[in-house]
């Protein structure tokens, strides 16, 4: 089963800045997106719901320091990417 990654314009702007600051993470970031698309519940992503506000968001790990926040729509199998950055930037 495959999921649809939805890149909003806002996310693409955040992503562009993130990759410009961290070009060394490009391969790991691409692998994380591929895993999200194939199996968002893969243990290495450490997918978990975020507590508090805003509600309805989840977090997936790129590595120990960087995360992707996302909305997970299981019925439509859509994953709406919200933000990417360090732990402090996305929470």
Which residues fall in each region the model found?
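Short alpha-helical linear motifs
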Residues: 31, 52-55, 70-75
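Basic nucleic-acid-binding interfaces
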Residues: 1-3, 9-10, 55
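Residue-level signal for beta-strand positions within conserved beta-sheet cores that form or flank
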Residues: 1, 43-46, 77-80
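Generic recognition of well-ordered alpha-helical segments
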Residues: 13, 31-34
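A short, surface-exposed loop/turn module that caps and links secondary-structure elements
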Residues: 35-60
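Enriched for short, Lys/Arg-rich terminal
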Residues: 4, 13-16, 20-26, 61-91
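Short N-terminal amphipathic alpha-helix/helix-capping patch enriched in small hydrophobics
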Residues: 25, 29-32, 46
């Amino acid at each position: 089963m495959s999921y649809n990654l939805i890149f909003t314009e806002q996310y693409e702007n955040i992503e562009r800045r993130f990759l410009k600051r961290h070009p060394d993470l490009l391969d790991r970031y691409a692998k994380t997106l591929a895993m999200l698309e194939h199996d968002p519940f893969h243990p290495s992503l450490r997918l978990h719901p975020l507590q508090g506000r805003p509600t309805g968001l989840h977090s997936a790990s790129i590595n120990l320091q960087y995360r992707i926040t996302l909305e997970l729509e299981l019925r439509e199998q859509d994953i709406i990417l919200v933000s990417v950055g360090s732990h402090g930037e996305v929470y």
